Swiss-Prot record:
Its main location: cytoplasm. Belongs to the MnmA/TRMU family. GO terms for molecular function: ATP binding; tRNA binding; tRNA-uridine 2-sulfurtransferase activity. InterPro entries: MnmA-like, MnmA-like_C, MnmA-like_central, MnmA-like_central_sf, Rossmann-like_a/b/a_fold. It comes from Marinobacter nauticus (strain ATCC 700491 / DSM 11845 / VT8). Catalyzes the 2-thiolation of uridine at the wobble position (U34) of tRNA, leading to the formation of s(2)U34. It comes from the Bacteria. ATP binds at residues 18-25, 44, 133. GO terms for cellular component: cytoplasm. This is tRNA-specific 2-thiouridylase MnmA. Disulfide bonds join 109-208.
Amino acid sequence: MTQNTEPQSPAHTRVIVGMSGGVDSSVAAWLLKDQGYQVEGLFMKNWDEDDGTEYCTAMTDLADAQAVADAIGIKLHTASFAAEYWDRVFEHFLSEYSAGRTPNPDILCNKEVKFRAFLDYAVTLGADYIATGHYTRQRPLNDGSGKAQLLKGLDPNKDQSYFLHAVSGERIARTLFPVGELEKPEVRRIAEEQGFVTHDKKDSTGICFIGERKFTDFLKQYLPAQPGNIETPDGTVIGKHQGLMYHTIGQRQGLGIGGLAEFGDEPWYVAEKDLKRNVLIAVQGKHHPLLFSRGLVSGPVDWVAGEPPAQKFRCKAKTRYRQPDQDCEVTVIDGGVKVVFDDAQRAVTPGQSVVFYQGEVCLGGGVIEQTWRDNEALPARLEHQASEGSDT
């Protein structure tokens, strides 16, 4: 898929905008049309609603997207990527939860559906580029590689580069991000000024296929409960859980272990999952040492540029969305990276992603597999590599 990463004149450039029925993609489409591009919209259906529930909002979202397309004066296509979503995203989502990890399906959805299935389909419709309403930016490399850098959005409160880190530089180069140059209040102002029905629409939260449902209720439809004990680090049983998959590291709510007089009033937090024993380890106090990790090991890393900047380098990282950038040292190892943070990090969660930055440039990221604390032995995987490296 070779393509000049610098758009030709807008009048000769055809862009298909992924329109979700939300305010951000509405304004993205309007901005491009206002700039003179040949613009069409496409509404993606990524989840099969025929599951007997009332929680999906696809029909309402489609109606809103159509109303905005009509207001702008552009054609709106519709396409179903539900099969791709199930095969490439949802089955992995269930597999990770059943293994006791906490995945982020939005990241995989962007990689496999929004910037793969959608982009490939848009090309068949004659698109030169796609566009989305993500708060991020891209910068063509202009080095003949056909790639672009992924940059943070200008609005620090809305920057979504964390969720797009797994998209390749080639596909980033084929995408325009009009609202990445704006702050959210300005986007809403434009939508209201244009009379879009989406101007005051609530931002979507959570995972698209769950909607407003309680997460545990949704998960129970697909994964059977596996009850077990909740214990303190010294092995004292203080409660029961219905399944490790329903809990995440650092979680406070939903443990059902309040009112234990002998332990005082400090709240309890999930510190660890003992997968072999099916035990949830809980500690008291938001700043308990067992909630903090000095480092982590990731699985394979998706580098936006296709390769890491070096075998060992310093940069900043996030282990969750909207976390302030954290200083760290990254070492490339077999099958992933080792990350050592300058400051211990709270509630680093296997299954979530660690994403790397140098300035405004998002380098890429990978899924967190293991963590270790201060004064704790390195994971065996790292000890093995360290012993091999000591001979050099």
